[in-house]
Amino acid sequence: MDCKVHMETTVSRPVLSPTHINATASETFTVLQQRMRIVEEQTSSLRDDLIMLDFGEKRGYLEAPDCLEDLDSQKVISPIQNEAICAGKTDILWKNCEFLVNRMCRLESLMQSLKMNIFRLQTEKDLNPQKTAFLKDRLNAIQEEHSKDLKLLHLEVMNLRQQLRAVKEEEDKAQDEVQRLTATLKIASQTKKNAAIIEEELKTTKRKMNLKIQELRRQLAQEKYLRESLEKSASAMLLKIQEMGSTVEVERKQVHILQQNCIALRDSIQSAQELLAQEQKKKEELEIATSQLKSDLTSRDDLISKLVEENKNLQISFNKEHEENAYLRSEIMSLHEASEKAQVLNDQLTKKCSELSCMLQTVTMEKARIIADHQAILQVEQKMMTQTFQEQNLLLDAAHASITNELQTVQNEKTQLQAHLDHLILEHNQCIQKAQDAEKRTAVQKELLESTIARLRGELEASMQEKKSLLEEKERFQREVNKTEKEIVQERCNLEKELAKNKVDINTLTHNLQTLEEENKHLADQMASLELQQVTSDYHGLAQQKVEKITESKNKLAYENGKLQIKVKQLEEQVQSFTDTSLQNDHLRKMNKYLQTKYAQANSELSAKRVHLQQADAHLKEVKSILERSKEELSRTVKCRNAALKESQKLKEDLEAVEDRENKKVGNFQRQLAEAKEDNCKVTIMLENVLASHSKMQGALEKVQIELGRRDSEIAGLKKERDLNQQRVQKLEAEVDQWQARMLVMEDQHNSEIESLQKALGVAREDNRKLAMSLEQALQTNNHLQTKLDHIQEQLESKELERQNLETFKDRMTEESKVEAELHAERIEALRKQFQTERETTKKVAQREVAELKKALDEANFRSVEVSRTNRELRQKLAELEKILESNKEKIKNQKTQIKLHLSAKANNAQNIERMKQIEKELKQMELIKDQYQKKNYEQSLSIQRFVCEMTNLQKEMQMLAKSQYDASVRNKQQELHLEAERKIRQELENRCQELEETVRHLKKCKEATENTLKEASVESEQITANLEEAHRWFKHRFDGLQLELTKNRLQRPSGEDRWQEKDQDVKHDVMSNQSVLHRWERKQNLRPMPKKYHSEVQRK
């Protein structure tokens, strides 16, 4: 009885839970290990007791399997792998510890129940030695049932192991995929950052390109201005040539007047013979002077012959240069086709020429009036000649000295002109070489640009294809997401249906429970009646059998209940993890939608940028049309130049004819003078000397007047040009101000666009950060699931160990029971005698125990019903959780496919980034080429500024020369009053001959200078056109690739029509500004060769 009371106290003691103790993980582990050792010792002792109770016939059930023979050699699995545990894992660890502690408490309670049963069996054997055979049969039946249950459990454990392995493999795969996803997300964020940087760099390059285009426009305006100035200078040259023709006609008239004067002089000679008698003394002195003048004339004739020979040599060289000019003209004819388009400018020039012709007519009228006044003055002077005859002898010496100085100056000019010609020939050769080098460079650059354009087009096509593939993948992802959502909804509906079914099952189970309780009551009544009827021994045996069945069923139910509770907890944790993953998936879907909206916004911004690029293409096309117009204008100017050259050739021929006529006239005059010499001898010689001196003075006066007229006309033209230039400068300044205002507006718009893009980039970065946070959360959940899996695996391994221990214990118990059965067979015979004596005492005890057993039966039945109900619920939950696992596996597979597609898209993005880098390198190379071109243009502008400075200096020198010539003219007038009439006539004839020769030389030199300037202008225009063509080709090839996409986006944006109208107005304004730039450039090109021409003219004067 004392032992019985002790067992009841052990069964009824409360189970201690470890959650009330604030212990560490290591302490809990040691406590659990100690308890496990105690349990193992107790199981070994129970096995020995079973062997003693004759369970030795079937030892195979209690033998340990081969896998558990070396338990000591196996390592103990610790539930704590690392002491440094994250804050999120501590709760899981403590839950696992609590679970293990509860399990150990259950095992202890089970062991205590086993001890009580063994004690009861021992007492029964001691009290009933006759029932050993019955007990052996019962034990064998129990062992068979137990072995069957163990086999079933073993199969379930194997299935669970396989499932756990599959789950573990899938979770490992999921971890790898999550790591890949994190890596891909990081790379995607980096690619987005790189794309943002690339966009900013492209914007900066676009700004630079706009600035460079504006600089080119300014340069074109300057070059247009220069071209206009060159055209004006060419028109001035034509006017000068016309003036020279008019002077030649005037000189012809003067020669006719001189002939008439000669006739009048012959008449006056007859009247002068009467005066010769009085002036014989003066004649002797004059004869001495004439002898000196004859010697001077002979020396002059020699010089004239030398100059004629040099003139012939110059004509030969001129013919050679003429041939070269013909070759150049053949080359220039290719430009005539482009010059046909410049008729508008020619119309303007014709208007200006008509105005200038009107001015010329007025000037000729004034000149005729001046000549009439001059003739009147000459008549007055002829009257005064008789009075000033004595003073002319002194002035002749001064004239002789001045003539010698003039000859020296002529020789110096000749040497300078030859050096200048050599220098021009060298420059011409250098220009030809430069043109050839430039053509080669342009060909090479053209090939490079074509290759780069072809490669860029290929890359554009590839990027478009990649874009299409990405859009298709995006649609596929959306479809898969929709499918998963539908599946989740269907699963929820199925779960709700299963819950309803479970509720119905629970109601049926409760009804069955009630029926079982009623049956138990009925059985209890039957048991009471059987006790009265049957013998106490038979009743005692049946009661014992029923009690044993009840206890065994109770133990089995408790064991299964523990297992099922563990499985339920595990499955609930898995369900929670899957719910977390589903929530994360929902969050990711939301993020995907948000990113899709961002992608649409980025596409719209790209379309806007493409529209801007199309506008830039339109601007470039307009610039190209302006350049073509400028080429046409150039061709027209070249035609005008050729016409001017033809007119200069005609004038040259006319001048040669005039020279021939004048030479003939001079010969006739010489013959007439020879006849006069034969008739009048010395008197005629003296008269001829007087006429020569008078002619020289008159020629000097005419020269001075002509030069003064030219200077006045040049000064007036320069003043007009200055006024026109000032007006154009003002217009250009106004245009510059307008362009600056437009630039400011464009910069503001551009800045606003950049700010919007920066905001969009900031939002995209925040989205990327949110994605990174969500991925980190997913990783944390994945780690949490891994820890749970590890814990489950450890629990399974511990369960397997326990199962193996139980199998070994069962085998041992069977062996011991067999041994004990043999021993009890011997004891039973001895105990039968004792049993008869003790039967009466046991009847009383049995009655008490039957009452207690009835109570225990009622409780056991109630508990068995509850346990069966919970088992069914747990099995249903298991089935549901297995379905959820399968659905989650399918979702994981879908996510894997999505990850693979994302990785492929990422690889394509990396390839696109590499291509963008290559394009950036090529753009940098093109920018370097542009910088070189800008440097060259800057050097040209510096040379133009130097030329302008030289022009101002030359104008100052011309003013000084005009003043000095005016003073010389005043002195010459004073000297002419004192010269004799005969010397004037002779000097006039000689000076006219020299002037004609000088005019011929001057015209030749002007022609050479104009041809050289035209050559230089043509070479420079070719260089500039080549450079502009290169720049245009580059811009055209750069923006042709994007034009198709821009036209597509134009149709999608009808709101941009107003912008196009505004931009068309801007384009028109740009055309006008570009025309002004071309005029400036033409003026610069015309002004470059001017300093040499002016220098030579100054030296001649």
From Swiss-Prot:
Domain of life the protein comes from: Eukaryota
Keyword Coiled coil: yes
Region called Disordered, residue ranges: 1055-1101
Keyword Coiled coil listed: yes
Compositionally biased spans, kind Basic and acidic residues: 1055-1071
Keywords in alphabetical order: Coiled coil
Coiled coil: 106-299, 398-680, 712-940, 970-1033
Record-given protein name: Coiled-coil domain-containing protein 150
Source species: Homo sapiens
